[in-house]
A protein has these predicted regions:
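Edge strands and adjacent loops of beta-rich recognition modules
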Residues: 1, 80-114
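Short Pro-Gly-centered flexible turn/kink motifs
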Residues: 3-6, 122-138
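Polysaccharide-binding surfaces and accessory modules of carbohydrate-active proteins
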Residues: 4, 10-93, 152-168, 172-175
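Conserved, well-structured core segments
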Residues: 23, 120, 184-186
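Beta-strand-rich interaction surfaces with strong enrichment in secreted/lumenal proteins
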Residues: 41-42, 106-109, 119-124
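Active-site-adjacent structural elements in folded domains
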Residues: 115-118, 169-170
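Short, Lys/Arg- and Gly-enriched loop/turn segments at beta-strand edges
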Residues: 138-147
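Structured secondary-structure scaffolds
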Residues: 170-186
């Protein structure tokens, strides 16, 4: 598997504003309710620009985050102290939110957990856009690559697919609506 991911966010407001993108990788929590379930692991890698993932049945993967300003790790476990007033994990899953919103010391400085977010901070002017790229691969020693050719190929393939299925007589607006409708079916 080799997935290239591109996320674009645009400031639609009238003022310059900070934008925080936090693409997140996590494992479904099955270990806390099944005593014999192994606990998977996410850990910082690639000089702080990648997350290595290890799972008993899913194997090993790497999420490469070349433009990340930081990697935040917590455990994908409920905050028992906040919800029930009982002790829980040192770094519960809401730690990413608490770090971003309140500046709290709620992420694991050791760079490991079962949930990780790649922090991308951008200051955008009105109408300005920021694009980040990520790569999720089973090549555990992989590095960031220029994904532009991959995206160009996939966009050409998508254009060819829709051209073969949409009536040529449709105007561009209706074609865009039809493409969105098809995408909702995938």
């Amino acid at each position: 598997d080799d997935l290239h991911i591109r996320i674009t966010a645009t400031n639609r407001g009238p003022d310059t504003a900070m934008l925080w993108l936090l693409p997140t990788l996590w494992f479904r929590n099955t270990w806390s309710w099944r005593r014999d379930a192994p606990k998977p692991r996410l850990a910082t890698a690639g000089a702080g620009k990648a997350i290595d993932a290890e799972h008993d049945t899913l194997g090993r993967r790497r999420l490469i985050c070349p433009d990340a300003d930081g990697l935040w790790f917590v455990d994908n476990e409920t905050n028992g102290r906040r919800l029930y007033g009982v002790d829980g994990p040192a770094y519960p899953k809401d730690g990413v939110n608490d770090r971003l919103v309140h500046g709290a010391d709620t992420v694991n400085a050791a760079g490991e957990g079962t949930k990780a977010a790649a922090l991308h901070e951008r200051r955008l002017g009105p109408g300005e856009a920021a694009t980040i790229t990520l790569r999720l691969t089973d090549e555990v020693d992989a590095r960031a690559v220029d994904a532009a050719p991959v995206f160009a190929r996939r966009m050409a393939e998508a254009d060819a697919f829709y051209a073969s299925r949409l009536p040529a007589a449709l105007d561009d607006d209706r074609k865009a609506i039809a493409r969105q409708a098809y995408a909702g079916l995938l």
